[in-house]
From Swiss-Prot:
Highest taxon of source: Bacteria
GO cellular component, one term: cytosol
Organism whose genome encodes this protein: Stutzerimonas stutzeri (strain A1501)
Chain spans, region G4: 136-139
GO molecular function, one term: GTPase activity
Gene name of this polypeptide: tuf2
Keyword Hydrolase belongs to the record: yes
Protein name according to UniProt: Elongation factor Tu 2
Length: 397
């Protein structure tokens, strides 16, 4: 039978496996591709190929990540799996692979372990909105009470980090059985099929960038005689139409202006859309009233802030980061979208110093306000060199 051509008509959803080392994340990833290839007709990917994930760079950080894809009846899934714990930490903090939902793999034989907890915490900090649980290796547990106990522990852990533990779907099965095409007691293929159906029903369809409120980070500002001030940048999300009112947010007090023209490749358009590089003409705004590092946004949708809680990964020496630890009161530059702003770091109680290669929660206070919201990524730099990556976990003020 001829292979069907790739259809882009199904909604696209990004997921990934998280959980403790050796609980079966990669086996489940391989099993998902196998089951979906048989049931829904997508391509199968073998375990070894996923396990020897290639290195990639995100914001100058080396991360090993395997990307696979599979289809359900109604969706196309892109799935990330990381071989090592450090790769997960980096992946989630840099947003190299943003997840619309995560599959938490937990061994029924061992129950929740330190990285189970850490990955749930990271999911909360970086804004992974939904978690579905796969209790793996259930073929190795004969005791129904033990299974129930592990399930309760996982639910408690999810609730601890503000996920709806009581309502989280938990599928019990064996990834290895599913990978080998076995299905005793419906723990193999059936369980993985059930997992895919749960992803379909439990993770809502993500809002596309174009459907979100307009936002464009300003990269450059020009004044064109007789026309006024033009700011250029890449539209991050939404659409800006000519004659719409927009706000200029960040670095200075927020001001309102009107878009009087959109230009792309020297052509005049009536709108600029998510993903496009364009110039936006601003009515009545002077050249020195806007600067790189501010954003154009739909009025009322984003505010400037200076203080926030962040989850940060500090580059190791091998990654070109610092060679020495830093202490409280550390004052690097924080690079948001298009600009650096100096800020000071407050470390959690009991943490005296942060070593290269660590991840840490910190409270940052910037010297100038930046347009921000939870989930915004940033880099930490010293004199233009990246020494860390972070994500806004919670805005303080």
């Amino acid at each position: 039978m001829a292979k069907e051509k790739f259809e882009r008509n199904k909604p696209h959803v990004n997921v990934g496996t998280i959980g403790h080392v050796d609980h079966g994340k990669t086996t489940l990833t391989a099993a998902l591709t196998r089951v979906c290839s048989e049931v829904f007709g997508s391509a199968r990917v073998d375990f070894d190929k996923i396990d020897s994930a290639p290195e990639e760079k995100a914001r100058g950080i080396t991360i090993n990540t395997a990307h696979v894809e599979y289809d359900s009846n109604v969706r196309h899934y892109a799935h990330v799996d990381c071989p090592g714990h450090a790769d997960y930490v980096k992946n989630m903090i840099t947003g190299a692979a943003q997840m619309d939902g995560a599959i938490l793999v937990c061994s029924a034989a061992d129950g929740p372990m330190p990285q189970t907890r850490e990955h749930i915490l990271l999911s909360r900090q970086v804004g992974v909105p939904y978690i579905v649980v796969f209790l793996n290796k259930a073929d190795m547990v004969d005791d129904a009470e033990l299974l129930e106990l592990v399930e309760m522990e996982v639910r408690d852990l999810l609730s601890t980090y503000d996920f709806p533990g009581d309502d989280t779907p938990i599928i019990i099965g064996s990834a290895l059985m599913a990978l080998n095409g076995e299905d005793d007691n419906e723990l193999g293929t059936t369980a993985v099929k059930k997992l895919v159906e749960t992803l379909d029903s439990y993770i809502p369809e993500p809002v596309r960038a174009i459907d979100k409120p307009f936002l464009m980070p300003i990269e450059d500002v020009f004044s064109i005689s007789g026309r006024g001030t033009v700011v250029t940048g890449r539209v991050e999300r939404g659409i800006v139409k000519v004659q719409e009112e927009i706000e200029i947010v960040g670095l200075r007090p927020t001001t309102k202006t009107t878009c009087t023209g959109v230009e792309m490749f020297r052509k005049l358009l009536d709108e600029g859309r998510a993903g496009e590089n364009c110039g936006v003409l601003l009515r009545g705004t002077k050249r020195d009233e806007v600067e790189r590092g501010q954003v154009l946004a739909k009025p009322g949708t984003i505010k400037p802030h200076t203080k926030f809680e962040a989850e940060v990964y500090v580059l190791s020496k091998e990654e070109g980061g610092r060679h020495t630890p830093f202490f409280k009161g550390y004052r690097p530059q924080f690079y948001f979208r298009t600009t650096d702003v100096t800020g000071s770091c407050e470390l959690p109680e009991g943490v005296e110093m942060v070593m290269p290669g660590d991840n840490v929660k910190m409270v940052v206070t910037l010297i100038k306000p930046i347009a921000m919201e939870d989930g915004l990524r940033f880099a930490i730099r010293e004199g233009g060199r990246t020494v860390g990556a972070g994500v806004v976990a919670k805005i303080v003020e």
